């Protein structure tokens, strides 16, 4: 299989020697994106088996940032809450927006080899965006709170606040479903495929489908 022999790789990320902590709000989309990338690089390069929990605004896609870290042999896991749009007048083109989101998480599932776990929920859009800094990234060392339009962010290393958000996140997971599951067991994969297809269809297995 030619595809199986392809070596996927990326240039290593730059070094970040310290957390960019500040008591002030971070303003401007460029500054917000920059501090998010710096925090992620710092955490996975200074800690082992890092666990990251996050709930991101639709505008923020971290596919490249995480693939960059995973493909350079950094060991960490990510759990993400995904908001999927309902079919309603409040959410224009919900199917297209949900497919776009799916297209960004599939590469993460493959690059992470099972270390990326996306959980999804559907809810009223206004309820989701009822707070100015409702989105967040939780790491071992800090909490990043992010506005929906990426214009503003706040970073905190308060351990009590980090613990509070982490417990809140775990509570939310109990009401969400795992969107994609990865398995290295070929029999589990085949069984899942067969169970999801019609019993009277013909199954054909090829080395290069």
Describe the residue ranges of each PLM region.
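PLD-like (HKD) phosphodiesterase/transphosphatidyltransferase domain
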Residues: 2-85, 166-209
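A short, terminal or domain-edge coil/loop segment
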Residues: 104-111, 134-148, 168-183
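A sequence-composition feature that detects small, non-aromatic residues
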Residues: 4, 31, 95, 111, ...
């Amino acid at each position: 299989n030619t595809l199986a022999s392809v070596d996927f790789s990326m240039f290593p990320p730059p070094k970040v020697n310290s957390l960019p902590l500040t008591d002030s709000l971070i303003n401007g989309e460029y500054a917000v994106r920059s501090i998010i990338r710096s925090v992620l690089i710092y955490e996975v390069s200074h800690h082992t088996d890092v666990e990251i929990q996050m709930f991101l605004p639709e505008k923020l896609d971290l596919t490249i940032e995480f693939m960059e870290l995973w493909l350079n042999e950094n060991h960490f896991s990510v759990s993400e809450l995904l908001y999927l749009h309902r079919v309603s007048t409040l959410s224009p083109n919900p199917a297209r927006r949900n497919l776009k989101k799916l297209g960004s998480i599939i590469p993460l599932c493959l690059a992470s080899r099972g270390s990326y776990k996306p959980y999804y929920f559907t809810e009223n859009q206004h309820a989701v965006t009822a707070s100015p800094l409702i989105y967040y990234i939780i790491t071992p060392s800090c909490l990043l709170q992010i506005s929906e339009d990426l214009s503003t962010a706040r970073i905190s290393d308060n351990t009590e606040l980090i613990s509070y958000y982490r417990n809140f996140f775990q509570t939310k997971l109990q009401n969400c479903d795992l969107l994609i599951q990865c398995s290295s067991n070929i029999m589990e994969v085949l069984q899942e495929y067969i169970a999801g297809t019609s019993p009277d269809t013909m199954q054909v297995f090829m080395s290069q489908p």
